[in-house]
Design a protein with these regions (language model features):
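Short amphipathic alpha-helical segments and helix-helix/interface helices
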Residues: 63-67, 112, 139, 169, ...
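A transmembrane-helix-recognition feature enriched in membrane-embedded lipid enzymes
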Residues: 26-78, 133-147
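Residue-level signal for beta-strand positions within conserved beta-sheet cores that form or flank
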Residues: 73, 116-118, 239-241
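Helix-to-loop junction immediately C-terminal to a conserved catalytic motif
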Residues: 66-98
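Structured helix-beta-strand junction loops
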Residues: 73, 89, 144-147, 174-175, ...
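Non-catalytic C-terminal accessory region of glycerolipid acyltransferases
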Residues: 2-38, 42-43, 47, 160-290
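Well-ordered alpha-helical segments embedded in enzymatic catalytic cores
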Residues: 79, 106, 163-167
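Catalytic core of membrane glycerolipid acyltransferases/transacylases, capturing the structured
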Residues: 45-46, 86-157
């Protein structure tokens, strides 16, 4: 059976061949002992079995509920009618703008609370989360190990990032995953939330390699001060958080072309254009709340 993504152009039935996928742990000489152990541990939680089942239940019934309680009074969600009906056996990729550390938590927390059964996955910087033992604890407590795989900032370890992208593709292809990525590649610290950073090619590489439906979303209103954010929700005086979902992205013939860094950036730019369009809608929605 052809999946829904193929019918809208998001996932063509014939995909170009790709180079051999890299494995993060193949680069043992570039990883510290702590990084190796923590990557191995978190990776194993994604393997079918008791760990994976336990983490899915924790994300579904604990993580999503505390996010719901901490945001529901000031959160406004639009565009849900554009979303597909989620199939538990398929994987999905959400692409969002990046203003706050908590963007994807709020987006996916909302969906999980409305019966999306998928395992969550958000690539995260390696610094602290994978090179410090405390990072593993925070990853487990804050996200139930959704923060995986690690992304490495050092240019000398660029090959590790390609391996992390390939690991993301591998998990998406397995099915039952919901992955969140930011085409901008880093948090946008500018004053204007509607002025997005340039697209980076890594997201395009994942989109082309995985062949899953890509769901765009624009989110605005979240800060990075967690206590202040939570207090604003309970007093109902915090900045409104607006989440605006779009329909699955149609990439036309981009995904059937031979893979290359230039093509991957085009794919990322196309996804970012959809996010930008949703941002224009969000601006109008926000104005109507005043």
């Amino acid at each position: 059976m052809t999946n829904g993504a193929a019918s809208n152009g998001a996932s063509p039935s014939v995909r170009p061949s790709r180079e051999k996928e890299r494995q993060l742990l193949d680069f043992e000489d570039q990883l510290s002992p702590v990084e190796r152990k923590q990557i191995t541990f978190v990776r194993n939680t994604f393997e079918p079995g008791g760990w994976d089942r336990a983490v899915r239940l924790a994300q579904r019934y604990i993580g999503s509920n505390w996010i719901e309680q901490c945001t529901k009074n000031i959160r406004h969600v639009h565009g849900t009618e554009r979303l597909p009906k989620f199939d538990r056996n398929k994987s999905y990729l959400v692409v969002a703008n990046h203003r706050s550390f908590f963007d994807l938590y709020v987006v996916t927390g909302y969906l999980v609370n409305r019966d999306m059964p998928h395992r969550l996955l958000f690539p995260v910087r390696s610094q602290f989360f994978y090179d410090k033992p405390l990072g593993l604890f925070v990853n487990g407590v804050m996200s139930f190990f959704a923060m995986y795989p690690p992304v490495f900032r050092e240019r000398s370890r660029a090959a590790l990032n390609l391996a992390s992208l390939d690991e993301t593709v591998r998990l998406l292809k397995r099915g039952g995953m919901f992955v969140g990525l930011h085409p901008e590649g880093q948090r946008n610290k500018g004053d204007d939330p509607y002025e997005l950073l340039p697209a980076q090619g890594g997201v395009g590489r994942v989109i082309q390699g995985a062949g899953v439906e890509v769901l765009p979303v624009f989110i605005n209103g979240l800060g990075n001060d967690l206590p202040k954010q939570v207090a604003g929700n309970f007093t109902r005086k915090g900045t409104p958080i607006i989440v605006n979902f779009g329909a699955p992205v149609d990439f036309g013939d981009l995904l059937t072309q031979p893979p290359s860094p230039r093509l991957h950036k085009k794919i990322s730019e196309h996804a970012l254009d959809e996010i930008r369009r949703l941002g224009a809608e969000e601006r109008e929605i926000r104005a109507s709340l005043r």
